[in-house]
């Protein structure tokens, strides 16, 4: 059911590539294709005689895209890859969740990241082919796609010399930012990105204009440093208000 909904409007065919007749159908489809995408285990297409390299030699205008867990080569290339494993190994799980334990992102973000990376690379290859007439070989892995998304935590750790702490819905470098409890146990999420928004929150919502110039909260850096104190003030105010009134 999920597969049908996600692939709505697409034409599909199911082939047994170990069957000679079905394999012939596959090769016939490839001969007429602009793009060949596969996510079999590294080396599988070589054994079948339809490696990306051999296909591009036979069809120079063909764009090929090999998707794997950890890349086509290297010590991890033969290992099975699952979304949860990649979330952990890339460090994503370590910056999600609560201060008590790591957390999994609630969607298959590694699969999605690899798909998006493949998509944009294929579009670039199509533009290039319009100019040169030649296809291109593309390799995408779940791990490298997600590792690229982890660039900011990496830079904060390596060059900022500080470990990124898990903060739930809070932001490591912005405050106030996160979910707060209102009257009747309703929840509201706010994200204050600049001093103008901070001033508006204090004067228009919290009705506490004196907080704007308070030394503890006079800059974003100070607000982050005194996050617990600030969150307590906001929760105390919001706790007496209905979400619709905020």
Across the structure, where does each feature detected by a protein language model lie?
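Electropositive phosphate-/nucleotide-binding environments in soluble metabolic enzymes
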Residues: 20-23, 27, 103-106, 116, ...
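Generic non-transmembrane alpha-helix signal with a bias for helix starts/N-cap capping motifs
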Residues: 23, 38, 48, 122, ...
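Rossmann-like NAD(P)-binding element
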Residues: 6-46
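Active-site-adjacent "lid/gating" segments in soluble enzymes
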Residues: 32, 46-192, 200
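Aromatic-enriched alpha-helical interface/lid elements that frame and gate functional surfaces
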Residues: 176-246
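Short, small-residue-biased leader/transition segments that mark boundaries at the very start
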Residues: 1-2
């Amino acid at each position: 059911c999920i597969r049908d909904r996600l692939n709505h409007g697409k034409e599909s065919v199911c082939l047994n590539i170990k069957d000679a007749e079905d394999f012939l159908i596959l090769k016939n489809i490839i001969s007429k294709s602009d793009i060949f995408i596969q996510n079999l285990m590294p080396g599988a297409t070589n054994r079948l005689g339809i490696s990306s390299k051999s296909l591009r030699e036979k069809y120079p205008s063909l764009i090929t895209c090999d998707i794997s867990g950890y890349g086509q080569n290297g010590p991890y290339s033969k290992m099975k890859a699952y979304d949860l494993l990649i979330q952990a190994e890339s460090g994503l799980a370590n910056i999600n969740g609560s201060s008590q334990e790591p957390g999994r992102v609630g969607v298959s973000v590694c699969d999605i990241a690899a798909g998006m990376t493949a998509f944009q690379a294929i579009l670039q290859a199509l533009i290039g082919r319009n100019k040169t007439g030649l296809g291109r070989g593309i390799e995408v892995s779940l791990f490298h796609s997600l590792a690229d998304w982890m660039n900011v935590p990496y830079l904060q750790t390596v060059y900022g010399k500080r470990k990124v702490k898990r903060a739930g819905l809070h932001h490591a470098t912005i405050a106030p930012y996160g979910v707060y409890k209102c009257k009747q146990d309703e929840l509201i999420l706010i994200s204050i990105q600049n001093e103008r928004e901070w001033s508006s929150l204090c004067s228009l919502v919290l009705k506490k204009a004196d907080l704007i110039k308070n030394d503890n909260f006079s800059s974003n850096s100070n607000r982050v440093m005194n996050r617990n104190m600030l969150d307590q003030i906001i929760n105390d105010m919001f706790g007496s208000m209905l979400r619709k009134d905020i």
